[in-house]
Swiss-Prot record:
Organism: Stenotrophomonas maltophilia (strain K279a)
InterPro entries for the chain: Smg (IPR007456)
PANTHER family: PROTEIN SMG
Protein family per UniProt: Belongs to the Smg family.
Name this protein carries in UniProt: Protein Smg homolog
Pfam families: DUF494
């Protein structure tokens, strides 16, 4: 089985980060747990670097622009994110789940993954991790989390 940064991130998110913040262990304990779970130290370190970059790039808390410019995707972004993924990001932004800065952070973190292409499910996990890390995004995170685990996602009203 090919491990990826996303595999490590999903394992961390499902087993540690979704718990109470006080229960999150130090990096050495997390790394030991990941090694015991079968992940390679190389992928673990890449995942920690990904998380460090996410934490360092928190957008400032500001009012979201209602009618901002349309995002034009560049070649590498078009290669990694198919039409469905790009449409999903537009949907989230138009419905106030993501603002433009958060969308850019999601794109940055998606592009930092070691995968040639992301499917919609992978992108949804990236969005969820970004929202989890954003102060003031609790409602958007809760909505996104609900959508992740529903058979038929609810439309926004």
């Amino acid at each position: 089985m090919k491990e990826s940064i996303l595999d490590v991130l999903l394992y961390l998110f499902e087993h540690y980060f979704s718990e109470d913040a006080d229960l999150i262990r130090d990096r050495d304990s997390l790394q030991n747990g990941l090694i015991q779970a079968g992940f390679s130290p190389t992928e673990i370190n890449k995942a920690f670097d990904w998380l460090d970059a996410l934490a360092a790039q928190r957008p400032s808390v500001a009012q979201a622009r209602v009618d901002g410019p349309v995002r034009v995707y560049h070649g590498p972004e078009l290669d990694k994110l198919d039409v469905e993924c790009r449409g999903f990001l537009l949907y989230l932004e138009q419905h106030g789940i993501l603002d433009a800065d958060q969308r850019e952070l999601v794109l940055d973190r998606a592009m930092a993954l070691d995968q040639d292409e992301l499917d919609l499910d992978d992108l949804k996990w990236v969005v969820l991790m970004v929202l989890f890390n954003q102060p003031g995004s609790e409602a958007a995170y809760a909505w996104m989390e609900t959508q992740m685990f529903m058979d038929e996602p609810e439309p926004l009203h």
